[in-house]
Amino acid sequence: MAFGLGRQRLGLAAGIAALFFRELAALYCVICWLLDASERRWRLVAGWTLGMIAYAVFYAVHMSQVGTLVDTAARAHDEGWLQLGGAGFVISTAQMNAYLLVLPQWLSAVCLVLALLGAAGWNSPAGKRLAWTLAAYLATFAVVGQPFNQYWGCLYAPLLCFALARSVAAVGDLLKASGWWHDARTSVGHVDRVVAGR
């Protein structure tokens, strides 16, 4: 949201802070790094780079300390993170939105598709960042994550509201581009003239 409001430094600080809270935010940080590099925002690129290096050092120190305390038999589960959960797992992560959590899963699937359409049609710097973030997390969660990791959707599900709001305009643009919207309006106008006796 900070990037959408033109507050790049705040967005950078929030992204790096999120990374220190949860390593899953690394994907967002890499996306921001790539987008800022493509737009030649070198100060932001430097900020992302320094933040990710600081996190890598922090994580290495953490792993070295924890590694000496944890026995190899103390694993939480035997299966790996690569689960290929596909659309089912992705839709379950999309439900981690205050509105979608209480609705049936099929409705979450419809909202997810509409939100992706809205994100794809949002042609602005903020829209680009949102669309790439959604695409990256959805692609990742289609192959990575245990069924009990549904809560990972909290990373991206709040963004679905913004993209869903844009879906109405995106559907309108698609209808206009297809010519169907013009044909439908012409047909309705013709019916109105026939009914009016003109």
Which positions does each model-derived feature cover?
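Membrane-interface junctions at the ends of membrane-embedded or membrane-associated helices
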Residues: 4-13, 36-44, 164-198
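Transmembrane helix irregularities
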Residues: 3-6, 17-24, 57, 61, ...
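Hydrophobic/aromatic-rich transmembrane helices and adjacent perimembrane loops
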Residues: 149-169
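Hydrophobic membrane-targeting alpha-helices
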Residues: 2, 29, 33, 57, ...
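Membrane-lumen/periplasm interface segments of specific transmembrane helices
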Residues: 30-116, 127-134
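Membrane-interface alpha helices of multi-pass inner-membrane proteins
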Residues: 1-2, 8-36
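Transmembrane-helix signature of polytopic, lipid-linked glycan biosynthesis machinery
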Residues: 134-151
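Membrane-embedded alpha-helical segments of multi-pass membrane proteins
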Residues: 21-26, 107-111, 156-163
